Amino acid sequence: MNLNKSNKFVVIDVETTGNRPQDGDRIIEIGLAVVWNGEVTKTASSFVSCDQEIPPFVSRLTGITKDDLIDAPSFSELAPRILDDLDGACLVAHHIDFDLQFLNNELERAGYESFQGNVLDTVEMARMLYPTLDGYRLASLAEQFNLVHDQPHRAGSDAEVTAHLLLLMKKKLYALPFVTLQQLEACTTDTFSGMQLCIYEAMKTVRTSHHKNDSSYAIYRDFALKKPQANNRTQAKVSIPFHAEHFFGKDGALSSISPSFEHRNGQVDMAENVHACFEDGKHLIVEAATGTGKTLAYLYPAVYKSRENEAPVVIATETVALQQQIKDRDVPLLEKGLGLPIEAAVLKGRSHYLCLQKFAHFLEQIRGARQASYDEQLSVAQLLIWLTETETGDVEELNLPNGGYALWEELKSDPESCTHSNCTFFSRCYYPRARDNARQADLIITNHALLLTDHFQETSTLPSYEHLVVDEAHHLEEAAGRHLGASMSYQHFMRLYNQFGVQENAGLFANISVVIDRHPTAVSADWPNERKQELQSLHYEWNQLFNALQTAIVKKDKRTRQKSEGYLPEDVVDTNVFDAWKRVEAGGKDVIRAWRSITRTLKKEALTPAEETLLQKVNTLCNDLEEAQSILASLLTSVENEVYWAESDANKRPDRLRLYRRPINISEQLSGKFFSNTKSIILTSATLTVKGSFQYTIDQLGLTDTQPKCLQLSSPFQYEKQAQLLVPEDFPEIRQDGEERFTEAVAQFLRSLTSSVNGRILVLCTSHQMVKAVSRMMKPHMQRLNYSLFAQGVNGDNRSKLVKQFRNQERSILMGTTTFWEGIDLPGEDVRALIIVRLPFAPPDDPVYMAKAKQIEASGGSAFSRLALPRAVLRFKQGFGRLIRTKRDRGLIFVLDKRIIQARYGKVFLRSLPTLPSVFAPSKELLARADEFFHDGKRP
């Protein structure tokens, strides 16, 4: 590696006619920035003449037109100066593969050799050094670090910003502890050479400096860990008074410390009711519409009760986003209002937390015989940096590459590895620390999954508590169903099988063989081969079982195009399935017995810490395999009040088969083991009523006999002034006119609407098929409309990434299905128009819905009125709530489903919404109304 000029970096950025130089695409602009001795010493940019047409989308993205290239120099004219700058330097680019292939293509066309020096990718470097960022686009990084980036997608500006980003990242790299740099050097052999160069130079500098270890780090067993914040738990917690009006009132404590404070009567009412139910030991259901400030309304009485009882109050949410919002935004605001510190601890399931002992063992492996993949190396580097920054060790903080999440399965905490007696890292480990923090906290913020696990499996993960708030409570019934149900797939078995490492020189076999060689008298030399044969036999039987299952299920249900296929275990478990399952069951027991036997035998030997960790991993894998076999058995055994179904891919491949089971009705379980075991539970959400009634929620959650108190709080927004609901009367209907005509009408309506809205449009669909079909029809028109389109499943499935891209473009359309109907906050100009394509009824072939409906019909009830309609109304209200998020928002809601006006049940949807102007008219009239709404002088 050439280190003579290791302090010189040349950043290159190119704008091109396309993405494929091998197909003739050419550079049309090149930007360059020289970084030398820690400073940007030179910047330059130039248009580049070429004989290719500039595609319209490139011109729209960059602003470069063919006129700009008329007098531009050729690349061959620019090449000598570029090569002079590159002499002895490390070449840097943001997405180096792209820029380097174009640069080398042009160099070779001009008669020069391609660049052969060190290269550095700032995307790779940023991913490594900033492992918790949401994204690594240059514009996002510039915004994150306050770098001036006036002309995105112009080569000169992009190169200069990348140069300043490089300097920031080098500064961070050189500030890392020496032990972290040592670990990085050992695990980045597949990164770009420039990255290795930077790490090597940082190591040299830090090794010779007098401040090798910053006081903010704790160096423990070759890891640099962030020191946890000192706690002052020796001080007695101060009790607080409770007076909702004094706290939330117009001249209350909150008004004096919050610049965005708005007095809301509903907030006061909710706080008082939560307080009263906590005091009286009663349950409360609160529907708090958007804008009522429900989070603070329950946090204030929750802290009061916690201090009064000297015991934590638990707050449970469905989504990670709300957990973080409560911890990072709402609790600090409450602290300011109360004028005292509040201890709020986030506690999740064990698998969310990193096991340091496993991580240390993995590092030892990749420094030895194990060959780590590129994704594993990048993930390890991210984890090493993250350890210097995280106090929680929670994977939710990380933005790992795709392969990194498979690695996490190896590194996450589990009961075998995480015990005080056998873990050298126990005093530093994150999961025990999280549990300890929870025991001392005023508020424990957790998720529905852990809450339900604690109740139904009696794991005692959560400390003892009497008072609970369930936010996002409209998800509780579904979450409980998932928890009380089960699923298993062929792929899950394969992941377990691969962890044994039967086919590779890695995994358990490679490691256990080394241990056996070190203790030859303890275990027979033939042991590994015998175990491999057992596992290969078990693998064969798994294949046979899933082939038999797929055949039996498809034979039973000829609708092979259906995504889900219901089955009854007694119908599917024919002779072939039964015999295959018994062979799998027996083979699995043999494997588990043999591997547990060797751990017992080897534990009698004098083992190294690494060997101890390996045996813990063996036990964990045996437990996982045993659990998987038990779950599969439950999916092949009929139980009353359960529904069973299977899913596979379009080709019905057995290796893509997944089996599910769910309880049809969980009201009895919730009533008996959940609500009866907690003194006071507050259930809250923005969507819990249908037509102003809580009865559907009460029935679903098993609260019929409990008689909870109910409170419905209307929104403080003036919907009659801020929004309108518009329904086109001339729109086709899917049932009568066909899906193709309906889809074409949706696309045409959207195209027509863009000129009136002139801003962001959110489109909510009820199926992925609809999203893809409308997106396909819209795509050819987006350039003419000067709009960007982001569609779930077309532009990716990452919701937060799609929302961020949507918000970054002023004229954009975001299309999504289920997960986009709730949980995304798009205030103000972020959404000007909301399109609800169809009323969100559950698919009629949904297995759980079908089973529930059948049960209701069997008892003489109407499945439509008691199940389908309430579900759809609650989902509709969630979607409706995406538009108006603050008192200053204005926007239009278009419902392209005439049933909301024409069907008898349509009024149930309308009566569940706040009062606002509703118009049922031809499309042209609604588009004219939209034009008037957005251009009446009240908005730009």
Region locations from a protein language model:
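Acidic two-metal-ion nuclease catalytic site recognized across multiple nuclease folds
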Residues: N2-N4, L168-P241, E245-H246
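Conserved pre-motif I regulatory segment
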Residues: V238-I285
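Conserved non-catalytic scaffold segment of RNase H-like nuclease domains
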Residues: N2-N118, P131-H153
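Walker A/P-loop
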Residues: E279-P301
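A substrate-engagement module of RecA-like helicase motors
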Residues: A224-A230, P241-G252, E310-P312, A316-D442, ...
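Conserved RecA-like P-loop NTPase helicase motor core
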Residues: F717, P728-R741, G793-I900
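A contiguous, basic/glycine-rich beta-loop/short-helix subdomain that forms a polymer-engagement track
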Residues: E409-D442, L452, Q457-T459, G588-F731, ...
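Signature of the SF2 helicase/ATPase Hel1-core->accessory helical subdomain module
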Residues: Q324, P415-L443, N447-A586, L688-Q700
